[in-house]
Amino acid sequence: GVACRCDSDGPTVHGDSLSGTLWLTGGCPSGWHNCRGSGPFIGYCCKK
């Protein structure tokens, strides 16, 4: 999958730690949670 930035990764410009995985449809898989809050964002940023 494609890495995405969770809210807990912080708003840093350089050296972002992308700990989430991008899911475009259907929300996060079972056992995962959406780690990205509000804002203009396509899909879901999911984390185990």
Swiss-Prot record:
GO terms for molecular function: sodium channel regulator activity; toxin activity. GO terms for biological process: regulation of signal transduction. GO terms for cellular component: extracellular region; nematocyst. It comes from the Eukaryota. The keyword Nucleotidyltransferase does not apply. Disulfide bonds join 4-45, 6-35, 28-46. Keywords: Disulfide bond, Ion channel impairing toxin, Nematocyst, Neurotoxin, Secreted, Toxin, Voltage-gated sodium channel impairing toxin. InterPro entries: Anenome_toxin (IPR000693), Myo_ane_neurotoxin_sf (IPR023355). Pfam families: Toxin_4. Binds specifically to voltage-gated sodium channels SCN1A/Nav1.1, thereby delaying their inactivation during signal transduction. Belongs to the sea anemone sodium channel inhibitory toxin family. Type I subfamily. This is Delta-actitoxin-Bcg1c. It comes from Bunodosoma cangicum.
